[in-house]
Amino acid sequence: MRGFLFLLSILLRQGQIVQNILNNLIQPSLKKRIIGIDVARALAVIGMIIVNFKIVIGENGLNWVKSFAGIFDGKAAATFVVLAGVGLALMTNSAIKNNDKSKLKIVRNRILKRALFLFIIGISYTTIWPADILHFYGIYMLIVILFLTSKERTIIISAISLIIIFPILLSFWNYEIGWNFETLEYQDFWTINGFIRNLFFNGFHPVIPWTSFMLFGYWFGKQDLKNNKFIKKTFWVCTIIFILIQILSYFSISILSEGNQESAKELTEILGTNPMPPLPIYMFNGISIAFAIITACIIIAKHFENNIIIKALNKTGQLALTFYVAHVIIGMGIIEAINPSKMGEYSVIFSMIYALGFSLICILFAVIWKKHKESGPLEWIMRKLTD
């Protein structure tokens, strides 16, 4: 009997050693970043740079260039927020699947700290960049914390509810209150009522309904993103939905306006895909294009993992926070320092060339920086303060 127990203990120890070896072999692949996510994040940041430079530096000139730049309006930012939701899911998936409450508590606290960090960073330069998304971002994250362990159905219903609630709010409150749309200034931003109104209802990226982008991203991140069938199906479904919404929007405005320019302008606010106000047609348009871009990036990055462009965009996406802040402080700051009185008066071609040039510098910086450092400058500070 003793001999049997001794033999059993040896076998158990051997089994444990084998298990540890297997875990060490398997874990790295499980923890490996999905390259396509970072590539999509890089493209989203570049899209936001194009949109924001166009607004701030100037968009005078050729209509076709303005139309091209206008493609990114609201869509790059929506993709950026959806990707944040995906990131939150990837942070929490392991703890939730293993029902590891202590690990989940640590991750929840980390998300809470990062939300506060982003809120403070965003608010700190709102005076020079009123269209900041980071302080909104922080509030979205605080709300998503409430849904970390919720069922997927609850997450989707909550996200759709936020989209539906917004037009209901419009029937009670004036969307234009506080705004000077000629200068894009929010007149009572620094009052309690004005700040809360801007944050939740009629700011550039209001909590209602923009939090739904992050909730949809969180739902998406909980899926099996290494399942090729799911990724390809999502790509085609969302691409078709996006195209159908664009067609529906265009023909609805054309038919109902009957060629009247004033009517077309008014109808565009309701049936168009512009981000302000963020009505359901824009929200679903933003969600569909975000999923289409993310899944396309996952598919392409998987097939061309060693491609120099994919590698560069992968590294750029990992420094997305740094580049978002840099495009305001450095990118816009340089142009304003050269000629403050001309801000907003430059041609759209100049704004586009400058945006693409700045984006290229960001990519080169990311490639060089990642050779020496694991995290971007601002990402490193955030992790030091929140991990």
Kindly give the residue locations of the regions a language model identified.
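Alpha-helical transmembrane segments and their immediate juxtamembrane cytosolic regions
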Residues: 2-387
